[in-house]
Regions:
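Charged, low-complexity intrinsically disordered terminal segments
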Residues: 1-236
């Protein structure tokens, strides 16, 4: 969802989703579990009543660091590995671990069009720098990297093959995949995937594609910066 404040309304690009009906339980259940684990001792425990209905069309994945559970990372990898035609990713911070990187490259090698949309300049300059070493490997394998212009794209979304989508709080970086409390909804819905693809296509009109030629021509000073800042990746 959106951050709240004037800068986020005018200078950030985010994606919001509204859930109604039976699927609300997916988020409600996560809130109940989180509240009951971290609630103040003076506050009441919320009842855990179980699902009111079962549906595979909308499900939620929650990272729970206190239990060492990180299903969102597996959800991303599984969806990418299933792709046969296209993968469209939007993320604010893109620092994939080796398994996520390998799944993206494997998809591109089998003919899947993989497009990754990230901000050209995010609000975390260190995250921008430690992400850069991955660009060359991805570009050489045919993965498209698009740089969003004039605003901070903060969405965390992915669609696969026009049938599966996720919208949530998790970036593709170490903190989101292996550290933070995060929640992502996954949708098995062609209409929603089609809408997400329309939004992605519109976002590309405000982005520029990073080419392998441009990447290979970056300056020596830039390359030195990448090497020097690379060891700081575990911090972001």
């Amino acid at each position: 969802g959106y951050n709240i404040g004037d800068p986020f309304a005018n200078e950030w690009r985010d994606t919001h989703v509204r859930i109604t009906g039976e699927a609300v339980w997916e988020l409600e259940n996560g809130f109940v579990d989180f509240w009951n684990h971290f609630r103040p001792k003076t506050s009441p425990e919320l009842p855990d009543q179980g699902a009111r209905a079962w549906s595979a069309d909308v499900t939620a994945q929650f990272n729970l660091p206190h239990n060492l559970l990180y299903p969102i990372r597996g959800m991303y990898i599984d969806a990418i590995e299933r792709a046969t035609d296209r993968v469209l990713i939007t993320t604010a911070y893109f620092i994939p671990d080796r398994e996520v990187l390998s799944s993206l490259i494997a998809a591109a090698r089998r003919g899947v069009r993989v497009q990754v949309l990230i901000p050209e300049y995010s609000n975390h300059i260190l995250a921008d720098w430690v992400a850069r070493p991955y660009y060359g490997e991805l570009l050489r394998e045919g993965v498209e990297i698009w740089l969003y212009q004039h605003a901070m794209v903060h969405s965390k979304t992915m669609t696969v093959d026009g049938r599966w989508s996720t919208i949530g709080t998790a970036n593709i970086d170490r903190l989101s995949m292996r550290g933070n409390y995060e929640v992502c909804l996954q949708f098995f819905s062609r209409p929603l995937a089609a809408r997400m693809e329309e939004i992605f296509a519109n976002d590309l009109t405000t982005a520029r594609r990073l080419t392998i030629d441009e990447w290979e021509k970056r300056s020596t000073l830039t390359r030195v910066g990448e090497v020097l800042l690379g060891p700081l990746e575990p911090l972001v």
